[in-house]
Regions:
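Phosphate-interacting basic helix/loop segments used at nucleotide- and nucleic-acid interfaces
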Residues: 256, 260
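Alpha-helical assembly-interface signal, strongest on the long, hydrophobic N-terminal helix that forms
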Residues: 211-215, 219-220, 225-227
């Protein structure tokens, strides 16, 4: 009886796993690849139904990524990056459309993460969202928006990239780096450390969305719940993430989740 029971349990488990939503996370450009590398370290991709991809025009950066799934885009870039020019990042994605179409196939939820303002991520993220959307995936972008100190050109590039994403994404979560300075202790950090705080929020946002769909909790959110929320939304979203334990954990987690709205209003982005 025991072998049969164990075999039946394995069949049920395999069946349940086959019904899990196929989630693909695409880290695009330097910031996106940094995020996807962190997600790998956090073991987000331990299950077969959540897969991560590192996508870049910079061959050296891809070589340093621990992910198995890597895509070097842009023949004319020759693996040397996009030089901070989003039009070159977009051209690289167009040149590598066959490879990108292959990795966006058979996807139910596509999460595209990148830093807005540079070349590869800003230019290629919208194209990847378009390909995923064309093949029937629900698309969510999780991106950062530049600090004011990064200059007008990077903010202009970021607006360009966000507009491309708006055309093809169901929802965009924007993490405004400037808002990080409102968090106690961040304002006095060196700029490199402040960037890492932004990267951490990027990683936590993606993990939060993926784990809501794949991890049991007191209140379960399934794929159709998420689809309903997104379909009736405005395309602009906010996410708050909090975690706590012990007495008062509900209040503590709620306060942590409200520390930073990780998606600003359009006015916040413009400012």
């Amino acid at each position: 009886h025991y072998p049969l029971r164990r075999q039946r349990q394995m069949c049920i488990r395999d069946r349940l796993e086959s019904l899990q939503p196929r989630i693909r996370v695409y880290g695009v450009g330097g910031a996106g690849c940094n995020a996807i590398n962190r997600l790998f370290e956090e073991r987000l991709f331990k299950n077969s139904y959540v897969t991560g991809y590192a996508i870049n025009t910079d061959a050296q950066a891809l070589l340093m990524s621990p992910l198995e799934e890597k895509v070097l885009i842009g023949r004319t870039a020759r693996g040397r990056g996009a030089g901070g020019d989003p039009t070159k990042g977009e051209a690289a994605a167009l040149e590598s459309e066959i490879a990108l179409r292959r990795i966006t196939n058979d996807t139910q939820l596509a999460i595209i993460t990148a830093g807005m303002g540079g070349g590869s991520g800003t230019g290629a993220a919208g194209h990847i969202a378009r390909l995923a959307k064309q093949q029937g995936a629900m698309t969510i972008a999780v991106v950062t928006y530049p600090f004011n100190s990064e200059g007008a050109l990077r903010k202009q590039n970021a607006e360009w990239g966000l507009e491309k994403l708006r055309e093809h994404c169901d929802t965009i979560l924007v993490i405004p780096n400037e808002r990080l300075l409102e968090i106690e202790g961040v304002k006095d950090l060196p700029i490199g450390d402040a960037f890492r705080v932004g990267d951490e929020l990027l990683v936590r946002s993606i993990t939060g969305v993926a784990e809501m769909l794949t991890t049991d909790g007191m209140v379960n959110l399934d794929f159709e719940d998420l689809r309903t929320v997104i379909q009736f939304g405005s395309g602009v979203a906010m996410i708050g993430l909090g975690e706590a334990s012990g007495p008062g954990r509900v209040e503590a987690a709620t306060q942590e989740a409200c520390l930073l709205y990780t998606s600003p209003s359009p006015r916040d982005v413009e400012e």
